[in-house]
Amino acid sequence: MNKGIIQLLALSLFCISVKAQDPWIIKADKIDPANYYGVTVANGMIGIVSSSEPFQVKNVVLAGAYDMYGRGRVSNFLNSFNLLNMYLLFNGDDWDASKVKNMKQELDMQHASFTTTFDYGDVASIKYTYYSLRQLPFCVLMDVSVTAKKTVNITAASVMQTPDALRDVQNYYNEVDGPTGRISLLTSTAKSPTGKLQLCASNAFIFNEADSLAPRLMHEMLDNNMHSMRFSKELAAGQTYSYSVVGSSITSAHTTDPLNEAERLTIFARLQGRDGLIKAHTKAWAELWKSDIQIDGEPQAQQDVHSMLYHLYSFSREGTAYAPSPMGLSGSGYNGHIFWDSDLWMFPALLVLHPEIAKSLIEYRYERLAAAKQNAFAHSFKGAMYPWESADNGTEETPVGSLSGPFEHHITACVALAAWNYYCVTQDKQWLQEKGWPIISACADFWASRVERNGPGQYDIKNVIAADEWAEGIDNDAFTNAAAKANLQCAALAAKVLNVKADPDWQLVAQNIPILKFPDGVTKEFASYKGGGIKQADVNLLAYPLKTITDPAQVKKDLEFYESRIPNEGTPAMTQAIFTLLYSRLGNGDKAYHFFKDAYEPNLNPPFRVIAETKGGTNPYFATGAGGIIQSLLMGFGGLDITPNGITQVKSTLPSNWKSITITGVGPEKKTYVVK
């Protein structure tokens, strides 16, 4: 390669870096449909995934809505009505995609909005922004502006489209008299594939004019699964005309009367007005961002970290009993099921920054405790055995072809430890007594019945799938055993806090569960492990989050052994986040930085730097990876530590190219921590 090409490439990389340095806004200045991975705007209930096509969104995902269809003979996430699609015609002519020029998009993470701009030939410039309204969990807003380049008649429509998987579609166009005039409602309802759920959505226009001066609306059936309401308007050259569409989407999983509730919610939002809706949404996100991670020294890392926080905040919300799937509300990846990803990887990050949101994730587990107890009973165990994959009712949802359902038992300990950590951070004894203790004690009972008692130090846990999921049918997996011990120990601690009698068998079992080692002192992943490649962190989780291994020399020995066992491709992003965290705590900031970058940069997809599960993967957004990386910043570089007495700070080391990291809004007291 000649010197000139090298210099040109270097200049290009510099320009890309400069463009990417805004801490809050990710811009896509060139839209390539062939290399486009949508980014999600969500409010913890409704997720809207962007599209490379003008006036389209890829799909709309609604938390808590599942039915049995599609993959695996198990429950799957349902795509909801696509209620934000639109069309815009000029002078009655058909839309001509070839006239779309200068199309740009941007995600504003600070305000949780997504904006598209483009020119339509020499006729008009268009800008639209949509929001998944944070203050209204079932509502969305689209804000549109059209600037005429010459005198033109526009026809604008809001389009309601039903996903193909839904059946028994019914479309309505209703008019309701409001306090200032008539409100027109574009409404659809349909059944889920088996008829289990009723899904409903409703839209209304918001005009800036007084209702008496607003454009006249017309209803139009476009297809059996698609209808619209439209208006026409004459614009003079240079004139800008703005309008909005507000909508709601809800199902019978959320309310007993979703059809009427969808229309009620749309009317409620419509009467708040466009400015009122955006103001309340912006205020809600400003409150969320009071808990932030600020990096001084690397603008691109700062933007990337904001993106991870943005997605974690977007995929969860206070006051629910929902937990995020590995892909959050970005689509139907992993069928929308809940795994240990929620409890071990996302929950701790949310717990430190927003305990009130984290509470929703553990509430999800509490409400499904009865199902976990039934699962334990069915497998001959006592207590509660949480399913590897969970959906709406807490029963096992793992497809039969995967053995993780009956054998990946460590998730039960992960749920219990999440409940204990919630108490540790909040110090809420009433919650611990009413909800935490039932979870923690039932999970401890499971482990006491799960072990095989083969003598002192040999309370074995046999025939499991490890956290390293390439290891199936193995005995005494390091993480499973250590997590079980931690569950039993925290149950005893919780009993002491509540002044209730702990089962003495818990401590006996905990003391006798083995953690195996090689002759050279390296912690052994499982009994028959010979040192081969592993899918993801297992042994290293004993140092964090379990704190089973605390000796720095042992932590380092295990790190150096297992970091060389992870293949460069095809493994999930969380592992490198744990390496980052542990190396930072060991004082090796530069090695921590290497793994920090390796945890996500090879996984990014254009144009919004969305994270896939694996290096080179194309299945964003991987919220599990984001949760792990945020933990590496909070508990690694930031040195935060969850203890029975609350959040404390331990010694940590920053990368040499970072000046400082500031973590704001930590814990219930909303403290600030700084590391320089």
Swiss-Prot record:
State the active site. Answer: E469, E613
Tell me which positions the record assigns to the signal sequence. Answer: 1-20
List the disulfide bonds in this chain: none
Checking InterPro entries in the record gives:
6-hairpin_glycosidase_sf, 6hp_glycosidase-like_sf, Gal_mutarotase_sf_dom, Glyco_hydro_65_M, Glyco_hydro_65_N, Glyco_hydro_65_N_sf
Supply the EC number(s): 3.2.1.216
- Provide the alphabetized UniProt keywords: Carbohydrate metabolism, Glycosidase, Hydrolase, Signal
pH effect summary: Optimum pH is 4-5.5.
One GO process term, biological-process aspect: carbohydrate metabolic process
Q: Which domain of life is it from?
A: Bacteria
One Pfam family, short name please? Glyco_hydro_65m
Keyword set includes Ligase? no
Please give the catalytic activity noted in the UniProt record.
kojibiose + H2O = beta-D-glucose + D-glucose
Characterize activity with respect to temperature: Optimum temperature is 30 degrees Celsius.
EC top class named in words: hydrolase
**SUPFAM superfamilies found in the cross-reference section:** Galactose mutarotase-like (SSF74650), Six-hairpin glycosidases (SSF48208)
Question: What role does this protein play?
Answer: Glycosidase that specifically hydrolyzes kojibiose to beta-glucose and glucose. Besides its activity on kojibiose, is also able to act on alpha-1,2-oligoglucans with a higher degree of polymerization. Shows weak activity on nigerose, but is not capable of breaking down trehalose, maltose, isomaltose, sucrose, isomaltulose, turanose or melezitose.
Family the entry assigns: Belongs to the glycosyl hydrolase 65 family.
Q: Which PANTHER family match?
A: GLYCOSYL HYDROLASE-RELATED, PROTEIN-GLUCOSYLGALACTOSYLHYDROXYLYSINE GLUCOSIDASE
Name of the molecule in the record: Kojibiose hydrolase
Q: Which organism is it from?
A: Mucilaginibacter mallensis
